[in-house]
């Protein structure tokens, strides 16, 4: 990614739209993008998060025919959700390859991935969608609780609607407007969901677990203590499914760790779970 980014910089100007709040929450990632030559433009409207960044990026794209629109999430108008899902499918391709080497079988019993807009889960699930023996579990962000009013559990409490050019599931207020999402995780606080995941959930092919901030934080410290791996806060939502679900001792469960947690250290160290870990 980095070498491609540098190469493109010789030909194209790169402008990255990012929610102003998310810039604060993901400062290390922002600094990396700047070092690679990108101009990071804060989205200052609305909740100042992913939803608003997509709004402003789409607006900039439509205003100038010389602009080329890229998005890393499986949301927006066709063909973007399908393109992103296919590009991300290298994840499930790699899962199959590694499982074959380690277990002699390509398919696990379960694949678990966190779910915001949907790129990570789309990639982890892609080559297993037509494998009915493989259970697909998406961990979406419940924030402070599904019924708290501060949540991003779109598939749990959302309804059908149109957002960013696609018909999908989204959270709405009493007037039918898009409702502001909340999650401690910057990558999961999106009020909608990719259309692929809306379809998988509606048809029953994908199961959904709503994971709170605290459950994700607890899972992050568990993995850090047990394996010495500090996961991204987004990935920690998927890890939390281990305690929320009952798995058999012989089940092969693949949990996709979508990123590292250095960007989330402030949230980790300020949480109540850090007290025991630091003593």
Give residue ranges: language-model regions.
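Short glycine/serine/threonine-rich phosphate/pyrophosphate-binding segments
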Residues: 6, 24-26, 114-125, 146-147, ...
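A glycine-rich helix N-cap at a beta->alpha junction
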Residues: 13-48
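Glycine/aspartate-rich loop-and-adjacent alpha/beta segment that forms the canonical ThDP
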Residues: 83-90, 249, 257-279
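Buried hydrophobic positions in well-ordered alpha/beta secondary-structure cores of metabolic enzymes
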Residues: 33, 95, 111-112, 118, ...
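Phosphate/pyrophosphate-binding loops at sites that engage ATP/ADP/AMP, CoA/4′-phosphopantetheine
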Residues: 97-106
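Glycine-rich beta-alpha junction loops
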Residues: 22, 47, 74-77, 115-119, ...
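Single conserved hydrophobic/aromatic residue that forms the stacking wall/gate
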Residues: 1-12
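Active-site/ligand-binding loops adjacent to catalytic centers
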Residues: 54-83, 105, 130-133, 138-229, ...
């Amino acid at each position: 990614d980095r070498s491609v980014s540098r190469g493109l910089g010789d030909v194209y100007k790169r402008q990255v739209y990012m929610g102003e709040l998310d810039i604060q929450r993901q400062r290390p990632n922002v600094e990396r993008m700047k070092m690679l030559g990108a101009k990071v433009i804060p989205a200052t409207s609305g909740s100042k998060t992913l939803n608003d960044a997509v709004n402003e990026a789409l607006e900039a794209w439509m205003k100038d025919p010389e602009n080329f629109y890229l998005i890393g999430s499986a949301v927006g108008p066709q063909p973007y959700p399908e393109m992103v899902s296919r590009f991300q499918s290298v994840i499930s391709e790699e899962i199959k390859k590694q499982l074959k080497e380690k277990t002699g079988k390509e398919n696990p019993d379960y694949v678990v991935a966190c779910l915001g807009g949907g790129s990570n889960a789309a990639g982890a699930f892609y080559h297993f969608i037509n494998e009915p023996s493989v259970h697909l579990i998406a961990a979406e962000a419940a924030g402070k609780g599904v019924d708290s009013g501060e949540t991003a559990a779109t598939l749990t409490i959302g309804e059908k609607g149109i957002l960013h050019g696609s018909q999908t599931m989204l959270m709405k207020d009493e007037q039918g407007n898009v409702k502001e999402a909340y999650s401690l995780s910057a990558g999961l606080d999106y009020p909608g969901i990719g259309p692929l995941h809306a379809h998988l959930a509606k048809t029953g092919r994908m199961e959904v677990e709503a994971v709170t901030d605290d459950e994700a934080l607890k899972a992050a410290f568990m993995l850090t203590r047990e394996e010495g791996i500090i996961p991204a806060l987004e990935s920690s939502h998927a890890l939390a499914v281990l305690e929320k679900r009952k798995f058999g001792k012989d089940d092969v469960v693949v949990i996709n760790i979508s990123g590292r947690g250095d960007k989330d250290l402030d949230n980790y160290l300020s949480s109540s779970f850090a007290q025991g870990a630091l003593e």
